[in-house]
């Protein structure tokens, strides 16, 4: 449900107010005050609605209303207030005693707006029209930074690879398993070990051989020397299958020389 009308529009006058109607409205308000605008027209003997009576009184019949044209000071004040408040005419009228909001709005559209345009000022924004933009547009690009980072990464990687290659060249390669025998032979591993030990003892290279007391005195090839016996025993012991002498007795499992 909407708001009920203030009066019956079928029995109200419309259009311009007559001088007689203005005098009745002024006389009633002076005698009784403004009061309720809904009941005022009937009490004052006016065939008008309450809204029409209120607007006629506020905008035209009030005794404190200023008559005549706007002054230059009022024009500058209206321009300043409009730049701060915009089109809020009722607030602007509150700062101008004796002037109504409707009067100020009409005066703005007919006079002040044209005055601002003649000065080259936009009436809406209150700025100079066709003013070059003073704002500097700064663009931030990350492309150069990314390229510099890529170049740094490539240079660091190249330096690291160069250092790694220099370390590989300068450092000798160490065998992880120096005692590992990779020779391919059919003979048993014990015989290979005995051959290597015999070769080291005969050539003198390799590990230190055991010297008896007679040899330590400088009497080599003496009967009391036990080094020759040890060597012959080692040689004979290494040839336990008779592969060197090619003489193997399967009955006694003893080797003999031809």
Swiss-Prot record:
The gene is MYB4. PROSITE patterns: HTH_MYB (PS51294). Disruption phenotype: Increased expression of C4H1 and C4H2. Higher levels of floral volatile benzenoid/phenylpropanoid (FVBP) compounds derived from p-coumaric acid (isoeugenol and eugenol). InterPro entries: Homeodomain-like_sf, Myb_dom, Myb_TF_plants, SANT/Myb. Negative regulators of floral scent production by repressing the expression of C4H1 and C4H2, components of the floral volatile benzenoid/phenylpropanoid (FVBP) biosynthetic pathway. This is MYB-like transcription factor 4. It comes from Petunia hybrida. It is found in: Nucleus. The keyword Chloroplast does not apply.
């Amino acid at each position: 449900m909407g708001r009920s009308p203030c009066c019956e529009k079928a029995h109200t006058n419309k259009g311009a107010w007559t001088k007689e109607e203005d005098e009745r409205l002024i006389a009633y308000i002076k005698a009784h005050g403004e009061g309720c605008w809904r009941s005022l027209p009937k009490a004052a003997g006016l065939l008008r609605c309450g809204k029409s009576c209120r607007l006629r009184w506020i905008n035209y019949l009030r005794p404190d209303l200023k008559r005549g044209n706007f002054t230059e000071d009022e024009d500058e004040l209206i321009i300043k207030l409009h730049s701060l408040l915009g089109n809020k005419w009722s607030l602007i009228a509150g700062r101008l005693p004796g002037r109504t909001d409707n009067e100020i709005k009409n005066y703005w559209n007919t006079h002040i707006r044209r005055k601002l345009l003649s000065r080259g000022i936009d009436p809406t924004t209150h700025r100079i029209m066709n003013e070059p933009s003073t704002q500097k547009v700064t663009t931030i690009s990350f492309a150069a930074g990314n390229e510099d980072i890529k170049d740094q990464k490539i240079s660091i990687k190249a330096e690291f690879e160069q250092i790694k290659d220099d370390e590989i060249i300068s450092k000798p390669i160490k065998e992880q398993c120096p005692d590992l025998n990779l020779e391919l032979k059919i003979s048993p591993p014990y015989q290979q070990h005995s051959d290597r030990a015999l070769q080291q003892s005969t050539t003198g290279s390799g590990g230190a051989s055991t010297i008896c007391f007679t040899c330590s005195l400088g009497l080599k090839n003496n009967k009391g020397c036990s080094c020759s016996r040890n060597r012959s025993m080692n040689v004979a012991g290494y040839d336990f299958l008779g592969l060197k002498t090619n003489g193997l007795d399967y009955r006694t499992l003893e080797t003999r020389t031809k």
